Amino acid sequence: MTAQNIDGTLISQTVRSEVAARVKARVAAGLRAPGLAVVLVGEDPASQVYVGSKRRACEEVGFVSKSFDLPASTSEEELLALIDELNNDAEIDGILVQLPLPAGIDSTHVLESIHPEKDVDGFHPYNVGRLAQRIPKLRSCTPKGIITLLERYNIALRGKHAVIVGASNIVGRPMTLELLLAGCTTTTCHRFTKDLEGHVRQADVLVVAVGKPNFIPGEWVKEGAIVVDVGINRLESGKLIGDVEYNKARERASFITPVPGGVGPMTVASLIENTMLACEQYHTK
């Protein structure tokens, strides 16, 4: 068996086109375009790249993108004051604070200060709690994007055993909640998990998000499994690879996300969808 690649680049473009059409219809009806505020603190090169891609995506679909680039010396109080201002700005539907934040700033405190109805990253405890209660609104972008990918490929999830490797607040934990909501039986593995191989070998759906190149050997993948590789690791050669040994895993899986071009593009597409949703459901007067 050779797995079919799940094309995140293609699906993300489709999602963006759908959102662009909704924006066009709003503006034609005399309503304002959705607004996203993107806050970057400091000059971390990777963060600058990510923020740039998010801003471009916003502009492509017709959003109003407002940029706030703050120096690394910014205090937590100054950042919280800006967020408070944006929370009260009627033309801003979403607030995105790029992580990581410089040392000395409590990221949990900052993320919790964003109004839940403008939390388009889906990190606020209120929004994670809604997902846990099976009434999601603004969902964490990467897990939401993964579910969108699987849905667009008509991959049925109900009744499958899903194994999530990695338990971060950004991917692993909300991914577990998403797959529970989709009707999977879920196992979440982390640094204290015993017999990781045994768990992985049982997975009908395998989601790996640990940030370690080729962490999961391809031979561990169950025949016919659906493999979602969230990892993006740059080797010294400059090549990007995932957390799963792709070539060997592809020989055993039925579907697999490549790196790059799999999950990555969907994170930004989900951010765009969330901003549209926030505008339509919460802020349209």
From Swiss-Prot:
CDD domains linked: NAD_bind_m-THF_DH_Cyclohyd
Recorded GO CC terms: cytosol
Catalytic activity: (6R)-5,10-methylene-5,6,7,8-tetrahydrofolate + NADP(+) = (6R)-5,10-methenyltetrahydrofolate + NADPH; (6R)-5,10-methenyltetrahydrofolate + H2O = (6R)-10-formyltetrahydrofolate + H(+)
Enzyme Commission code(s) on record: 1.5.1.5, 3.5.4.9
A single GO BP: purine nucleotide biosynthetic process
InterPro entries, per the entry: Aminoacid_DH-like_N_sf, NAD(P)-bd_dom_sf, THF_DH/CycHdrlase, THF_DH/CycHdrlase_cat_dom, THF_DH/CycHdrlase_CS, THF_DH/CycHdrlase_NAD-bd_dom
Family annotation (PROSITE patterns): THF_DHG_CYH_1, THF_DHG_CYH_2
Keyword Zinc appears in the UniProt entry: no
Top-rank taxon, per record: Bacteria
Record's keyword annotation contains Transmembrane helix: no
Pathway in which this enzyme or protein is active: One-carbon metabolism; tetrahydrofolate interconversion
Molecular function terms, GO-annotated: methenyltetrahydrofolate cyclohydrolase activity; methylenetetrahydrofolate dehydrogenase (NADP+) activity
Entry-linked Gene3D superfamilies: Leucine Dehydrogenase, chain A, domain 1 (3.40.50.10860), NAD(P)-binding Rossmann-like Domain (3.40.50.720)
Keyword annotations of the record: Amino-acid biosynthesis, Histidine biosynthesis, Hydrolase, Methionine biosynthesis, Multifunctional enzyme, NADP, One-carbon metabolism, Oxidoreductase, Purine biosynthesis
Residue sites binding NADP(+) per the record: 166-168, 232
Family as reported in the entry's similarity comment: Belongs to the tetrahydrofolate dehydrogenase/cyclohydrolase family.
Task of the protein: Catalyzes the oxidation of 5,10-methylenetetrahydrofolate to 5,10-methenyltetrahydrofolate and then the hydrolysis of 5,10-methenyltetrahydrofolate to 10-formyltetrahydrofolate.
NCBIfam families (alphabetical): PRK10792.1, PRK14186.1
Subunit structure: Homodimer.
Official protein name in the record: Bifunctional protein FolD
